[in-house]
Amino acid sequence: MSVYGLQRLYIGGGYVDATSGKTFDTFDPATGELLAQVQQASAADVDRAVASAQEGQREWAAMTAMQRSRILRRAVELLRERNDELAAIETRDTGKPIGETLAVDIVTGADVIEYYAGLATAIEGLQVPLRAESFVYTRREPLGVCAGIGAWNYPIQIACWKTAPALAAGNAMVFKPSEVTPLTALKLAEIYTEAGVPAGVFNVVQGDGSVGALLTGHPDIAKVSFTGGVETGKKVMSLAGASSLKEVTMELGGKSPLIVFDDADLDRAADIAVTANFFSSGQVCTNGTRVFVHRSIKDAFTQKVLERVKRIRVGKPTDADTNFGPLVSAAQLDKVLGFIESGKAEGAKLLAGGTRLTDGHFGSGQYVAPTVFGDCRDDMKIVREEIFGPVMSILEFESEDEVIARANDTHYGLAAGVVTENLSRAHRAIHRLEAGICWINTWGESPAEMPVGGYKQSGVGRENGITTLEHYTRIKSVQVELGRYNPVF
């Protein structure tokens, strides 16, 4: 018996059975318990979801922006009313501590929907005078049906981030959550329907990468928004272009640098570094896993980091006192342990952790100890590749020019941060760092108002912020002639 029973697809405002005849399992990563069997969508199911979305989108786009705004605000109210229920499901599905999901995942998702609900009425065109009796005006019109493909680390937050601007602009969305964490996207669909979103405007299809490929290549989908790894992102972009020149937004991986200068407040710097590496058990795309520390303060900084690592409370995710849970799956555990062994083999000095936790109740879950490596080099695998787990690499530097060059020596460019008391240096360094999301004397916050996205191979386009609405609309230009038409022939 599973905890949540059989999970179906959500199409046309309600649950429907998949036609594939296939299911997959989702497990609690803390206990190994079967949470649910989930029906996998077929090509016919994807077609049905897209057709339903087309029908719903026509009704949704015909509403006034104020009507759409009110409905989205109602969805926000429902998300907040059901915060505890949704957080409990998210904790079971992802392994995140309940204190984290209660305070972050649903809260930040609802904030983004509220933000775009407020902007729905601000989507405007321009009027451009040409001459006394002629002018041009522009309209921002919805794209139509968009596809959203989510990642497993922030299931409901990512679903909110992708749907909010799409729906605010009058689009519909067919969403595929990660098959590793498939549960809460269905709850979001229920909430949208209860709030008054027309049937079909938000549909959920379940499955692995093959279902994502069906969405990406579908001729009736106008845009794909994808969150995931770089190599998968390249495939998404290629298929989206080859199929119908779809617009794409992609938030991909990172290997982000955190630079601690010699004048930094060491307690603050250590707090930031620990948060930037061990929040959500290190499974955050923006984590600052390359920690560059000025040589003169490296030993003192490292000692403060290790003191804080000892205070991390690893435990059952459902316990309120826990602030560090398991990794999301056995596959992710194996990947992280492989990187740890690579770090040892390449000569990094293991300062903390480095092992799987197996004592007591840890034995049935996917737990790895918070891990810190010192004496790291830029050419090490743990320094160059995204691990997506709780592994910090500490590197030392001597000069600002040197550390900026080393920090930028990567094909990633998602995030970066500096810790310094010198405001001029802080801004100078940030302006030279090749990253789309940057922090000064802090780390990790991504409010609704802040555009989120990467440079280089860390992504295309942005999520959140006003600019994102531009990528869910298309501009129509209209010339109006009030005077006499002068024929050419």
From Swiss-Prot:
Keywords: Metal-binding, NAD, NADP, Oxidation, Oxidoreductase, Potassium
Binding site for NAD(+): G150, A151, W152, K176, P177, S178, E179, G229, V230, E231, T232, G253, C285, E386
One example of a Gene Ontology biological process annotation: glycine betaine biosynthetic process from choline
Modified residue annotations for Cysteine sulfenic acid (-SOH): C285
SUPFAM superfamilies: ALDH-like
GO molecular function: betaine-aldehyde dehydrogenase (NAD+) activity; metal ion binding
Annotated positions for site Seems to be a necessary countercharge to the potassium cations: E247
InterPro entries hit by this protein: Ald_DH/histidinol_DH (IPR016161), Ald_DH_C (IPR016163), Ald_DH_CS_CYS (IPR016160), Ald_DH_CS_GLU (IPR029510), Ald_DH_N (IPR016162), Aldehyde_DH_dom (IPR015590), BADH (IPR011264)
Cofactor(s) demanded: K(+)
Binding annotation for K(+) 2: L245, K456, G459
EC number, UniProt record: 1.2.1.8
Active site: K162 (charge relay system), E251 (proton acceptor), C285 (nucleophile), E463 (charge relay system)
Substrates-to-products reaction catalysed: betaine aldehyde + NAD(+) + H2O = glycine betaine + NADH + 2 H(+)
Free-text cofactor note: Binds 2 potassium ions per subunit.
Enzyme class: oxidoreductase
Pathway membership: Amine and polyamine biosynthesis; betaine biosynthesis via choline pathway; betaine from betaine aldehyde: step 1/1
Binding site for K(+) 1: T26, D93, V180
Subunit structure: Dimer of dimers.
Function, as annotated: Involved in the biosynthesis of the osmoprotectant glycine betaine. Catalyzes the irreversible oxidation of betaine aldehyde to the corresponding acid.
Family: Belongs to the aldehyde dehydrogenase family.
Listed name of the protein: Betaine aldehyde dehydrogenase
Organism, scientific name: Burkholderia cenocepacia (strain HI2424)
Name of the gene: betB
